[in-house]
Amino acid sequence: MQIKRKRLVKNGTDKGDYKMNQKSEEYVMNQYGKKSTFASFLPGIAGVRGIPIWCYYVNRGQGVVSFGVDNKDHAIMEFYPAHIAYQNVKRTGFRTFIRENGRTVEAFSNEDNAHKMQIGMNTLDIEENLREQQLEIHVAYFTLPEETVGALMRVVTVTNTSDEEKHLEIVDGMPVLIPYGVGMDSMKNMTQTAKAWMQVEDHDTGVPYYRVRASMDDTAAVSAIEGGNFGIGVTECGERLTAIIDPDAIFGYDNALEKPVIFRDGGIPAVKAEEENDSNLLPSCFFLKECTLQAGESTTLYEMIGQVENKKILEKFLNQKIDGAFFEKKRARAITLVDELVDGIATKTADTKFDAYCKYTYMDNILRGGFPIQLGHNKIFYVYSRKHGDLERDYNYFSMLPEFYSQGNGNFRDVNQNRRLDTFFAPFVGRENIHTFYSLMQLDGYNPLGVEKLTYTVSEEKAQMIFEDVEAGQRKELIDFVTKPFTPGKLYEKLA
């Protein structure tokens, strides 16, 4: 994946530690690891026909500190409040270890090296210059758009900046990945016990599938868990990288996850020789790559970590070619997707920073109030809305439905005030919001605190008429479905 970027200067500083890249409209923070703490997020926009993920990052370590699907109970990388996120990101966030001639270095672990962060509307890039090792590391994050699975995309590029050939061994990934089915309460209060339910399947395929064996609820009935979290790493041509699911195979006796003892002492052969445990543990998701780089040459690891409701969805998704070109195409789409959303407020003045500010402000309104679209002839529906549950607002329990036409919960005040702009930017909405919010007024005259997802129902009589030409067995199933509350996303899934 070719990402154009400015080379960091060798003394570890750029002119101006904070600036706006006027061409890409990205915010650049040089030497971010030494700056005042900062927390933000990817917008969780995967397209109308895409599965969103939530992803939070900070200006420490490799940025991303927590991500998942839907809400905090479906985390893939554990959710932390901001102050803990700053402490933990360099240990439980993404890690990159590089071994050359028996010496091992961890990328983004030494703030004295030249490093920078580039923040886009739907992307995050970080870069570091390892002067002593004469290597440059570039990491790109973005959300997988317009697919049937929700995933965080991570692209790691290592460049040989020396004048000589280098033979490198690389270990990159997550030291801790939460299996599907483990909620936030279990992670915070009984992780040791919860490990007894955890398992990893399909490790040998290069696409490990993480889930609990059965439901963890303290009830008489036990239910099967079909959903799973997954990870996949590939090369430029699509060859799958070896996945490591047991952190002990890399860190050995260092249970603090600080030093990759096994990898440090014996390299990739030693890691592969370890017998990995695939159950009753809090697993990892690392990928291995060994390569020889000529002067100025680069190697790239393409990684995707996500969540699906069942294996069939994942298997169908993997039928397409997943390679460097796939990642490049999806990154480009992630960028154009948000550009299209904010096109209505595109502003051209003498101040490019002001122009970019208008777009970012408009995007902020979309994320809280939602983006209006028309369903059918006269139905107004808002996609992308959600409660602002970021790292510094840890009290909010946000939700982003993992389905097409995704929507979420919100505070009445936030949603109401952030839809005021639709009067100008989306006049087709008309009086819809007046009707919506006045109908939510309570008998005592007060408004409710929260606004939940919008659902639809169809009367029995109308449903019979709509599906009269459908085969009998399917007709009954569809009628039963639409006569109960449903979302557009679930209806799409039902009909697909």
Regions found by a protein language model. Name each.
Residues 2-496:
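Anionic coordination/interaction segments
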